[in-house]
Amino acid sequence: MNNTPVITAVTVSQRIRSSSNQPSPEPSSMTAFLLSMQYVIEEGSGEGWFDDDLILWLTVTAVITGVLFIWRQLTYRQPIVSLRPFTDRNFTLGFLMNAVSGMSLFGGTFILPLFLGQIRQYSAAEVGTTMLVSGLVMFLSAPIAGRFVRSMDPRIPLVVGFALAAYGVGLGVRVTAEWGFWEFATLQAIRGAGVMMAMIAAQQLSVSTLPPELMKDASGLVNLVRNVGGAIGLAILTTILTDQTAVHLSELSAAMSVANLQGQDMLAGLTSMMEAQGLADPEGAARKFLGMALRRDAAVLGFADGFYFLALGCAAASLLGFLATPGKTKPASGGGGH
């Protein structure tokens, strides 16, 4: 569970209360909004979304407290989170792109180990070894990407970085049940280099045209949205994996039903194989084996849809880069991490 939005809310609330004796609904509305939103996006899929009363009421709570919080920031003379940076075009675009970079970073780190564990039955050590490629590439590319971003218009590395990330993650659309270390190594290397470049460039673009007095507020918003984007991305991926796997299983089951000639042939072949092994109930064993194979194939197709979602998000962020305006070249505030 991603607790950064909650920690941010609590920290800001404590600072406001300690610096003022006047009661204010702002800290509590922000905390309620972030807590409710985070629970809904992370638990909604598993609880059936609005079929669950708690999810429904927390959604209503998130909407009401979110609107209240934004209204207070726009009308209060000393808001705890200034929304003035959103009047800058580059910051608004960079804000959205940082959300996508968080989604790609956390989403890729979520979906790959899940595939390796569920489909390939990898041990924790084998999963860690495979995932090491992504972390290593991001670690090694961070200083190179930082220098690259600072040496030119940040829009160029932004577009290139997200395009690389989209291509890398897009390789996963062709995933099969036989994919292992080397297939995912290529995907992770391209994705890792692209995400690192995009993260640094998005951070740079966000503040490239802001006046100095808005830098502090902008930095906090950017760091927050990257983690919130990651949490939202994980919730969407979880929903995609659950729903699309069910859809694919239904389609595959229909194609392989006993009423279908291809399904009959496959079942007959499996039954003969089970008979040759001397099983007591060869047809029952064949049906069980076929069901397991269909569930595995449906899960693989669901993972492919998850990779497609991540690739689509990165591609959209790359296109947003063309809407940004040229800004001053400034040192990036940080290279990010993994």
PLM features: what roles do these ranges have?
Residues 8, 13-20, 24, 28-29:
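Low-acidity, Ser/Thr- and Arg-rich intrinsically disordered low-complexity segments
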Residues 25-27, 34-39, 47-217, 328-338:
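Transmembrane core module of solute transporters
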Residues 33, 92, 96, 101, ...:
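Hydrophobic alpha-helical transmembrane segments of multipass membrane transporters and ion channels
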Residues 41, 116-117, 148-149, 236, ...:
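Interfacial helix-cap and linker-helix signal at transmembrane-aqueous boundaries
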Residues 205, 222-326, 331, 335-338:
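Hydrophobic transmembrane architecture of multi-pass small-molecule transporters
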